[in-house]
């Protein structure tokens, strides 16, 4: 019983000590953020909605209507992009043992002639 208590106490102590575990989750407003470039820092409480990028640091999003228009235009063009072009007769997307058979069925593609 003592061994079980000591083991569980040690596990809880380790979880409390290391960052990114119970201690930080309990104090969520002080939760540290790990980044590759800057190490540990606490998120600032500004209302400007800064976006963190890995190269340039913090940026305020600009031209949001323009990006929304581009997104809407892309969504309008998506059916045209996805429309498949004409396929040659006998074309098969399959590979493996059936691929050579589908190539033989294409007229004009016989065995290689030297």
Curated annotation (Swiss-Prot):
Keywords: Amidation, Amphibian defense peptide, Bradykinin receptor impairing toxin, G-protein coupled receptor impairing toxin, Repeat, Secreted, Signal, Toxin, Vasoactive, Vasodilator
Region (Disordered): 35-114
GO terms classed as biological process: defense response; vasodilation
Basic and acidic residues composition-biased segments: 65-80
Localization per record: Secreted
Pfam families noted in UniProt: Bradykinin
Job of this protein: Potent vasodilator. Binds B1 (BDKRB1) and B2 (BDKRB2) bradykinin receptors.
Protein name: Kininogen-2
